[in-house]
Amino acid sequence: MQDEALQAAFEIKTECDEISRRLLRWHWEQKPGSHSLDALLRHIAQRQKESPDYYDRMPDLSGKTSWQQLDTTLCMRVLLDPEKDAAKPLDLLGNTRHPGAARRACNAVRTARNEAAHASDRTAAAQAAILFNEAVEALEEGYAGAPLRTSELGQYYRLAEDYLSRCGAKKPIASAAPEEKAPRAAKSGQNTAGRKKEGTSGSASVSYTHLRAHETGR
């Protein structure tokens, strides 16, 4: 069971990297100017000079020749860059319809990826699965319609359900009294992560049902 949970954690990390690449590329292609990977790498190199503290401990950029070589660490560092000291701020997230929701989604994906990357046991893998479920909900709030279609969000929700099941995260991670009813996976994820927000998380299937109803009602 632990091996299965750790395999799921590896898949969560991989999926978060793929999501991160997609978000960065979409944002990059919405801005004015060149949309090439080389232009992005030049931008990062310039920002490393302007803000060495923020861009500290970055993956090595040498030899990067395709978007597929970028990981969550690099992608989210660019997307979440406050750019306070940038000579030419891009404000990639600020150019979206819902900048706050986009920023929350990027943070959620980064958090889930980091948890999955460092998972060494079933409990940590379960936490990564819970955080991935929350990240999918945040992606729905920030990116539904563009660049993520309803069908794609549905696929992410199904992946989230699969990860939760394989990691045993549909029961509370902390032990509970026998008579207590196990909370929903996403709800226990809020408790574990110390979040206070109410009413925005439910099971992955409930969220997807809501998404489908919203889409068909347009």
Which positions does each model-derived feature cover?
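Amphipathic alpha-helical interface elements
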Residues: M1-G189
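Short Lys/Arg-rich cationic patches that frequently serve as NLS/NoLS or arginine-rich RNA/DNA-binding motifs
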Residues: R184-S203
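Conserved small/polar residues in nucleotide/adenosyl-binding loops
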Residues: Y208-T216
